[in-house]
Amino acid sequence: MASSVATLVKSLDKINAADFESDEAARVNAIAAAQKMIHRLQSGVERGIELTHQRSTVFPIIDVFEDLGLWEAWASQGHEISLEGLAQLSNTPLALNLLRRLCRLLTAADIFEEKSEDCYTPTELSLYMGDKTKGSQVSQGSAPGWVGSYTNLPIFLKETAYQEPLDPKKSAYSKTAGKSFWEELSQDPLQQENFGRFMSSWAKFKVPWPAFYDTESLVRGAEPGMPILVDIGGNDGTDVERFLAKHPGVAAGSLILQDRPAALKLAKVDQKIELMPHDFFTPQPVIGSRAYFFHAVLHDWDDAHALDILRNTVPAMRKGYSKLLILDIAIPRTGASLIQAAMDISMMSLLSSLERPITTWEILLKKAGLKIVKFWPDPRRYETLIEAELE
């Protein structure tokens, strides 16, 4: 029995992402299966320690490395480094044994690797966290305001008599920071830029939507001289660029990227794409586009505000011609993944908003005068593209 288990462990240890290079869905399923296997092997005490001690201590230390400038400085070198060398990269003098203890936790958590005693090797993750052009979701997601909102969520829910949080001005985040998430962004240009880069990085991680949605039908059915795609709240233009990459022959000006002026500053897009400042709480100025596209926008808002956004868009649509495309999480009736469920609680904590179940999407769109044509899940089963049109 012992030898067969040892053989199995060796086999499992050889599996890596390259084995699933051509099958993204299989890779995601393998991750889920591996995580479930770990949980089956752990005792209740072990899982409790993991949740209360192991995971909860990693994020603060990631933030310490961020404060010391170590992620960026190490990534710029990108090679093996000694403890002393790492200390020399710090923007602030620190005790060597303190750094050793911090590194011990981060290597045990596989954030970077321990090559030998007091010698470390970067990983894809640690290099990623040091690349400021990508706006790491790890460092952004472990920022004090975010972590504080998660920590304060139990207190916030108790103080609000365990009612579902749906007021964007009252959230666990606002309880922590003294202002809402959006208010803080609007008052802090640096934080707004960091958040924009974070969203850009997050978007690039996701499966490109033209890879699983029939964008060819949009181009084929488009009228000459009319807009084909309006990307509303599209940040740096990752999604509209992906559309253009698949359909490079579309006419200049037929693709439009809309967002707040501060967000559009991050957009470095092809000259065929028109940049247009727009507040999606005001009427959509582009009339009769083939498609209007929202990616990770509506999950930021409760139903009342989301309905307001939709009702400002619907009048611009043409019946029988225009499509409304929403790329967001659509939580299944059963069997939600951990990332889907965690994102829902994250939206609750930060914004008093939500990730919507499929049935909630159906009700919301119907109230806006829309009917769902089809749900298009991405291969990772994280997000779903909801195709809708006027009733």
From Swiss-Prot:
Tell me yes or no: is Transferase among this UniProt entry's keywords.
Answer: yes
**Which PROSITE patterns does the protein's record reference?**
SAM_OMT_II
What InterPro entries does the entry give?
A: COMT-like (IPR016461), O_MeTrfase_dom (IPR001077), SAM-dependent_MTases_sf (IPR029063), WH-like_DNA-bd_sf (IPR036388), WH_DNA-bd_sf (IPR036390)
Q: What class of enzyme is it?
A: transferase
Q: Where is the active site?
A: H299
Q: Which Gene3D superfamilies match?
A: Vaccinia Virus protein VP39 (3.40.50.150), Winged helix-like DNA-binding domain superfamily/Winged helix DNA-binding domain (1.10.10.10)
Q: Which GO terms describe its molecular function?
A: O-methyltransferase activity
Q: In which pathway does it act?
A: Mycotoxin biosynthesis
Task: List, in alphabetical order, the GO biological process terms annotated in this UniProt record.
Answer: methylation; secondary metabolite biosynthetic process
Q: Which domain of life is it from?
A: Eukaryota
Keyword Nucleotide-binding, does the record have it?
A: no
Q: What is its EC number?
A: 2.1.1.-
Q: Which UniProt keywords apply?
A: Methyltransferase, S-adenosyl-L-methionine, Transferase
In this chain, S-adenosyl-L-methionine is annotated as bound at G233, G234, D259, D279, F280
Q: What function is annotated for this protein?
A: O-methyltransferase; part of the core atranone cluster (CAC) which products are predicted to catalyze most or all steps of mycotoxin atranone synthesis, starting from geranylgeranyl pyrophosphate (GGPP). The initial cyclization of GGPP to dolabellane is probably performed by the terpene cyclase ATR13. The Baeyer-Villiger oxidation near the end of the atranone synthesis, which converts atranones D and E to atranones F and G is predicted to be catalyzed by the monooxygenase ATR8. Of the CAC's other predicted gene products, the reducing PKS ATR6 might synthesize a polyketide chain.
Q: Which family does it belong to?
A: Belongs to the class I-like SAM-binding methyltransferase superfamily. Cation-independent O-methyltransferase family. COMT subfamily.
Q: Which PANTHER family match?
A: O-METHYLTRANSFERASE AF390-400, PUTATIVE (AFU_ORTHOLOGUE AFUA_4G14580)-RELATED
Protein name per its UniProtKB record: O-methyltransferase ATR12
- Species, as recorded: Stachybotrys chlorohalonatus (strain IBT 40285)
